Regions:
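Iron-sulfur-associated redox domains of electron-transfer enzymes in respiratory
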Residues: 1-208, 218
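Helix-loop elements that line ligand-binding/catalytic pockets
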Residues: 212
């Protein structure tokens, strides 16, 4: 599967703006920390060059943001959709939550996103985070120099149990589309069934506290 880099996506975003296909692009920009990436709307190539970021911490799902963004009378908005994002996009579209004609959807492949909590468990005193060409995490620490963490050991749980690498809706697809996976995600159900009532309550309390009602789980 083709690996999508930050430069590749940034150039695509500028191409969409310069060609007039869209008037703005949903992307990611850095927050206070290297792992604190947040959705942002880009309207110029200069803004993209200055602020656009794409790496293993870009787990944010843009689909829900389209509900409000497409209500603006400001032309078409382009959005990058990972396979899991495309499921929530499809569900929200089915529920008529946004105007499809106002969106240019670009499907992108994804090999899984990084869980900052797993990185924190592996190293202390994080000063700077970057990724190598294979997606492994390079951590500069305050106390113990630099550490390299295997991306597969620090992946988000939902990515470990990913149900599909296939984008189900798009106007343009970058790279090759993936496949629906025959994974072992129901192993997690067995773990839940083995929990006590209090443990299950605590588990779902933690899961639902992060819910943004993107509706990907309903598709």
């Amino acid at each position: 599967m083709q690996q999508i880099t930050q430069d590749y996506l940034a150039n695509k975003a500028k191409e969409l703006l310069n060609s007039g296909i869209c008037s703005r692009v949903f992307g990611w920009k850095r927050g206070e920390f290297d792992y604190d990436l947040t959705p942002a709307v880009f309207t110029t190539a200069e803004q993209i060059d200055r602020e656009f970021v794409y790496n293993g911490f870009c787990a944010a799902n843009f689909s829900k943001y389209l509900v409000n963004e497409t209500r603006r009378d400001a032309g078409k908005v382009a959005v990058f959709l990972k396979p899991c994002d495309s499921y929530s996009f499809n569900q929200l579209l089915t529920e008529h939550r946004f105007d499809r004609e106002k969106v240019y959807a670009v499907g992108i492949p994804c090999e899984g996103m990084t869980d900052i909590n797993k990185v924190r468990q592996a190293v202390d005193g994080i000063a700077k985070l970057t990724f190598d060409e294979n997606g492994n995490i390079i951590v500069e620490t305050l106390y113990d120099g630099t550490a390299t963490l295997d991306r597969n050991e620090c992946m988000l749980e939902r990515c470990i149990h990913c149900k599909s690498k296939r984008c189900v809706v798009y106007d343009e697809l970058l790279g090759e589309n993936g496949e629906v996976l025959d994974d072992s995600r129901f192993d997690e159900v067995k773990k839940l069934e083995a929990m006590t009532a209090d443990e299950r309550f605590a588990f779902w309390q933690g899961e639902l506290s992060r819910c943004i009602r993107c509706n990907a789980c309903r598709d």
